[in-house]
Amino acid sequence: MKFYLAPMEGITTPVYRNALYRHYGGADRYYTPFLANLSFNHKELREILPENNKGLSVIPQILTNRAETFLTIAKNLQAYGYKEANLNLGCPSATVTAKKRGAGFLSVPEQLDAFLEEIFTVCPLEISIKTRLGIASAHEWPTLLAIYKQYPLKELIVHPRYQKDFYNGRPHMEAFQMAADALSDSGIPLCYNGDIASPAQYQRLLVQNPSTEAVMI
């Protein structure tokens, strides 16, 4: 099992990541809070500078719905030695989704598909995706899965809630199993994210979905 540290704005800073690594053994991967600017400000530079992340496998996360923005940020990350970037399609915040970014981008699957086609054609980095199931309806998820399966994703990280769920209610575990079944012959690794805050919750996940190979907490 692989364990990933989820990106949390203002919490999973370089100081936090290094403290976790030094005192508790760390995680297999650490994801940064999202980057959204064409050029990095002081705070963003602090997140990604290699000297602030020595010994850590850090994956920068990008938030945008514009291919040219994603590609510019990816090229800037490449200059700092990064090999992979993660696309944020999971943030449920209204200030983000109102601009069709984060989970809000899931509301326009045709535009999302065109965006992915463009970035996968020319991006210098490998690309993973962190996603929700859609906005509010169960019919959205099969459509999104079919889109994701077309592309050579480094990994698909699924938080099995809808954008409208925010962080309320229980995750839709049947949707996560649907992803596992859909991707079983694709070669795309699958990671679970959501409501793993205790050993008991982790064990319950393994009972319900024994094929799970990675967990983001």
Model-derived features with residue positions:
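Flavin-dependent oxidoreductase catalytic cores
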Residues: 1-217
